[in-house]
Design a protein with these regions (language model features):
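Charged, helix-rich terminal subdomains or tails
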Residues: 1-207
Length: 207
């Protein structure tokens, strides 16, 4: 099966290290392809660690490489090492590859994409997600669960609306994920990824 070409450049490849630069959403796809192909090639006997960093296109390459290496080092410190650290060097943004792909990308980001696919007001959608992010990051405040539920309720269409079934699935999952610490952190990461990937054309972020 031929895979779509990606806007990614190999800056350095040697030994057991590789440094890629490219369109940030393509970097995510490239990282997952490399991980999958490497696991297939080695029959799952070897592991990869990765750091994924988002910077403006004018950010110095040397500094990007250094900071990405810090994220990679953090991923290597994860139990089993077979992990990826994204955005910042923290345990909250470090995931085993399978969890990252299955739970963050295929589950949570996918739901965000499906729900917002038919939303006409993109900027309003982003503002809504930023409000959700604030509540997710401050979940230790008990009142924020009620605020989270209220925000979801404000999106509810009439039950005879064709979009109601999608809303019901979205709101149920979001509420459940908020209440589970592991799912909550994965949702935070998924929202970050979704927001970056839906920025207006003309933005010049790279990874």
């Amino acid at each position: 099966v031929t895979k779509d070409a990606l806007a990614v450049t190999i800056v350095y490849s040697g030994g057991d290290d590789v440094f890629l630069v490219g369109a940030w959403d393509h970097i995510l796809e490239a990282a997952m392809r490399i991980q999958e192909d490497f696991q297939t090639y080695t029959c799952h006997t070897l592991h990869l660690s990765a750091g994924i960093l988002l910077k403006n296109a004018k950010y110095p390459i040397r500094r990007s490489a250094s900071e990405a290496a810090e994220l990679e080092a953090f991923a290597k410190s994860h139990d089993g090492k077979n992990a990826v650290t994204i955005f910042e060097a923290s345990a909250q943004q470090t995931y085993p590859w399978q969890i990252f792909q299955d739970k963050v990308i295929n589950e949570k980001q996918n739901l965000l994409e499906r729900f917002f696919a038919n939303q006409e007001d993109a900027e309003r959608g982003k503002a809504f997600l930023y409000r959700l992010l604030d509540l997710l990051r401050n979940s230790e405040q008990r009142i924020n669960l009620a605020r989270f539920a209220y925000l979801l309720a404000r999106l509810e269409p009439k039950k005879n609306n064709p979009s109601y079934a999608m809303y019901a699935e979205f709101s149920k999952q979001m509420y459940q994920w908020y209440r589970n610490p592991t799912d909550r952190q994965q949702l935070i990461t998924a929202i970050y990824i979704y927001v970056y990937q839906t920025r207006m054309k003309g933005d010049t972020d790279r990874a």
